[in-house]
Amino acid sequence: MVTTVQRTFRKEVLHALHKAKEVNHAVLISYSRQIESLDPLSFFNYGAKKYTGNRFFWSDPESELTIVGLGKEAVFQTNQKNSERYREVFEQWERFKKTAFHIYEEEKLQHSAVGPVLFGGFSFDPCEERGSQWDHFSEGDFFVPALMLTMTAEGPFLTVNRWVSGGEDAEAVLEGLKAFAAEFMVPDFKQEDQAVIAAAEELDKDDWLKAIETATSQIKEKQYDKVVLARELLLTFDGPIQIEPVLKTLLDDQQTSYVFAIEQEGKTFVGASPERLIKRDGGTVMSSCLAGSIKRGVNEEDDRRIGLELLNDEKNLLEHDIVVGMIHNAFVSSCSEVEKPDGPVLYKTKSVQHLFTPIVGQLRESASIFDLIEKLHPTPALGGSPQEKAVDVIREIEPMSRGWYAAPIGWIDSQDNGEFAVAIRSGLIEGSTARLFAGCGIVEDSEPISEYEETQIKLKPMISALGGERR
């Protein structure tokens, strides 16, 4: 467990240095303090030069919590091709916490997502034949940032993470940390003209439509119940794509979604997902069943009519029930108590309405958030049902490399609080190109053209964030 202290700053720096000398290797000091208001996008933009390729952005629905990480002070990685990848990251994190020191100035800094925080995500399927576009994205990639901004209802907090060795001078470490945190200022982010979409290509569209026909035939033959098939849109721009304007548009337009970005060696995976996979707050865990979708209406009356149509649509209700059942069973196996409502309600984003059922549980002491990620991913909303068979089908007939699309992405802090979203409504940006992804659930009576139109709707948030409709 991370040593968390509020006593005299100097004394605790000495404690950390003594520990480093005792174990004969460096330990991490994580120094947190409350600061004046600081814009998260400005902070993210500030890191573009010094920390380019090593930044992370996270904002939950309604921006109740925003976390921005710059640099990689500690890296946790796995290339395990099975479920052991979750345990490997968890065990690396547990070992790290044993020699990490969180030093803060005030009692109120004992806040979720302040101090040592692990950012990152996993691939959708570690056994897929990975496309080169996903180079540098491992089966699991996580890091503790060098600098971190945490925006909460209680205000903004800055965390500085630094390795120290037993031979360092305590006064130098002390003054260096305090001076950096006290004087930290960044220029305001200023919106610049974004590159313009020059070309758009729907990759393997015909193969994707044929895959739906194959899937519906197999489902009718009772080979499986459901599979989610995704497709890819390749956009080419007239210049390099800047990530900050993309994030700003997503934050402005997709306020009921998780907005995220993670950089890896010149590539940025970015998106606005409406779907929570798992959240842990103390002993309470929460997940969202989000399956079954339809477009928004042109006005309030039309929107209400379309929403009622979704709430009474047998295909979408069946698809939703499959997801609810799977998530509920996963919670029952890891929780002492589980609660879920009797039926779904509507969850509305700017472009899409979804059937939504929340599930809440009390996690057993022996379980971790990584245990639930392993049990939940991929849910039937992202893979299909039965889980293992659906993933096999995706490998066989889906004409794209998923990489991190539709996979868990999020954070966990030193107290094991954390949250992971499902990385949908997303895209992979590199230079002047953007690969956008969207999928839909295929069941027995799915129609290829109708499913294609559904993916068109789901692509809209990212197309808009990148500069508008295709030109």
Swiss-Prot record:
Annotated source species: Bacillus subtilis (strain 168)
The alphabetical list of record keywords is: Isomerase, Magnesium, Menaquinone biosynthesis, Metal-binding
Please give the pathway this protein is involved in: Quinol/quinone metabolism; 1,4-dihydroxy-2-naphthoate biosynthesis; 1,4-dihydroxy-2-naphthoate from chorismate: step 1/7; Quinol/quinone metabolism; menaquinone biosynthesis
Listed GO MF terms: isochorismate synthase activity; magnesium ion binding
Q: Name one GO biological process term.
A: menaquinone biosynthetic process
Task: Quote the Gene3D superfamilies the UniProt record gives.
Answer: Anthranilate synthase
Name its co-factor(s): Mg(2+)
Under Enzyme Commission nomenclature, its number is: 5.4.4.2
Recite the lineage of the species. Bacteria, Bacillati, Bacillota, Bacilli, Bacillales
Which EC class does it fall in?
isomerase
**Which InterPro entries did the record assign?**
ADC_synthase, Chorismate_C, IsoChor_synthase, MenF
Task: Enumerate the residues binding Mg(2+).
Answer: E319, E454
Highest taxon in the source lineage: Bacteria
**Family as reported in the entry's similarity comment:** Belongs to the isochorismate synthase family.
Q: Which gene encodes it?
A: menF
Primary role: Catalyzes the conversion of chorismate to isochorismate.
**Glycosyltransferase recorded as keyword:** no
Per its UniProt record, what NCBIfam families does this chain match?
isochor_syn
Catalytic residues of the enzyme: K226, E275
Q: What is this protein called?
A: Isochorismate synthase MenF
Give the catalytic activity: chorismate = isochorismate
